[in-house]
């Protein structure tokens, strides 16, 4: 519960789907609403019983405690999905089944929310807000190009014959950069798979909200945001206002149990360390792990590598088990690797305090899976990226970073399609850390860092969008109070 007087200020309700990559940006949005708008916020999260890292993130996020967090028990969906169902399908079905519990929980609140905000996988709960007569919004913690593709998919579905990945030409989106076949999001890889029909539905449901919040900022993608608002382009598809209110990212608090990593970084020269992490759910094959180990060693650069057990399945195999697994990884590296890199690199099992590492001046480049949270953490820290997309919309993110923004380098071929060899890994690292090209990339990412800070500061674009939303919610709340609407 927020304030003692239940009618003293507006309340906003947020709904987060499972997974740290979804929970973290929702937590940050909640904190932004509290600190900028001075509202009370309740976050409903669908927890994951298998994620050991989740409690650590929650403890860190709520210091100091700004939002009320209520966990909804995840429903048992085992009888509703195929055992081999994709992560996307599991999330869509799980969030569909959570609707009765979410509706009951919101109805049981002692206050009437001024607005309900759901994340990308929670769009079916927009109907709950509609039934309760509450303003409804979607929060997409990704970039504008991804939103453009998502809401345009129902039209592409009619225009494109056969599989998207077999098209010879890039798919055109009005007013936006075309999407090449190798860039499409995972649900578009197979139109016969359930995750495609779920994604198709998403494209229809997003424009039914009263507005779309995005964890990015206007100056990062001005052309795409222009297209989303112009009725000659995507405005006729989006239909509702789009509010870029980012870049919202975690702030570095107490480092917890991994302070020795920061102690080690303190001893390294400025911008000398390669940080390697594939996000909260990304995994590599054993063959790729070995090649990456050799590439790091051959580059002759200092590094921190967050390692998970290799997988023989998809690259998102650790999505529901973030932070879990065995700590002993020695059997997965080249013989003698851990001995040879003792004075040069650190291998960290499972999880690391990423926001602390990214904020450290010794870090010179981030070898990343290009999940949007990690992208924002890198840009806002002024750190260049080696783009290594694995799943979801990460291929689109990698293209945006390398070809549009010029703040990253990437392998010639997709890591999800074939193993990236040690020689290419070595070259990519040295391009950033040693070659003149790295200085130019570092300059551009620092300019974006400044741009993001400007957007968030008073008078900036993201500040103004968030303030406008707050004013809208407060006006609605005051109207409800004056009408003494019952709850």
UniProtKB/Swiss-Prot annotation:
One GO MF term on file is: anthocyanidin 3-O-glucosyltransferase activity
Q: Which domain of life is it from?
A: Eukaryota
Residue positions annotated to bind UDP-alpha-D-glucose are 354, 369, 372-374, 377, 393-394
Q: Which tissues does it occur in? A: Faintly expressed in cotyledons.
Question: Gene3D superfamilies per the record?
Answer: Glycogen Phosphorylase B (3.40.50.2000)
Entry's EC annotation: 2.4.1.115
Keyword set for this entry? Glycosyltransferase, Transferase
According to UniProt, the reaction catalysed is: an anthocyanidin + UDP-alpha-D-glucose + H(+) = an anthocyanidin 3-O-beta-D-glucoside + UDP
Pathway(s) where this gene product acts: Pigment biosynthesis; anthocyanin biosynthesis
Q: Record's CDD domains? A: GT1_Gtf-like (cd03784)
Recorded hits in InterPro entries, A to Z, give: UDP_glucos_trans, UDP_glycos_trans_CS
GO BP annotations of the record are: anthocyanin-containing compound biosynthetic process
Q: Where does an anthocyanidin bind?
A: 22, 392
Role of this protein: In the presence of other necessary color factors, this glycosylation reaction allows the accumulation of anthocyanin pigments.
Q: Which family is annotated?
A: Belongs to the UDP-glycosyltransferase family.
What name does the UniProt record give this protein?
A: Anthocyanidin 3-O-glucosyltransferase 5
